[in-house]
UniProtKB/Swiss-Prot annotation:
It comes from Wolbachia pipientis subsp. Culex pipiens (strain wPip). InterPro entries: Ribosomal_uL15, Ribosomal_uL15/eL18, Ribosomal_uL15/eL18_sf, Ribosomal_uL15_bac-type. The keyword Ribosomal protein applies. HAMAP family: Ribosomal_uL15. Part of the 50S ribosomal subunit. Residues 34-43 have a biased composition (Basic residues). This is Large ribosomal subunit protein uL15. Residues 25-48 are annotated as: Disordered. The gene is rplO. Gene3D superfamilies: 3.100.10.10. Belongs to the universal ribosomal protein uL15 family. GO terms for molecular function: rRNA binding; structural constituent of ribosome.
Amino acid sequence: MNDAVKLNSIFTKLSKKKKPKLLGRGIGCGKGKTSGRGHKGQKARSGVSINGFEGGQQSIYTRLPKRGFKPIRKNLYSIFNVGDVQCLMEAKKIVKDSIIDKELLHKLGFIRSVKSKIKLLNKGKLREKFVFHVDFASEAAKRSVASVGGSVEILS
């Protein structure tokens, strides 16, 4: 039998793991008195820290200009390609002539929620006929689906 060290034979006992040094237990212990915080000053005090403070130098977020904004009601949608449908059919997760809608895409893990919006794009090649129920679709995707006999229904 081979006497080589194997991953399943290596183990460490809990007592062998190094414990962190206790702070503030008298000046003889090495981390006593000031407990590694130095003498006085703002950083030595408890409960005080200034986020982004760079020692008097102008901070990075005040040096850089303000740019853009984040809209509160941003219209997010998931992108779905016609080539993805062909891959799903080849993997036998969907059958030919089936309806591709939000419930099916959610079940297959393409979208997080049934409430999210879907946009159909024309990346990839579609060789089978499918019916799509999506919120948005590019003109090229509509032509691609129609060329194989399928249809795209835009949900309102």
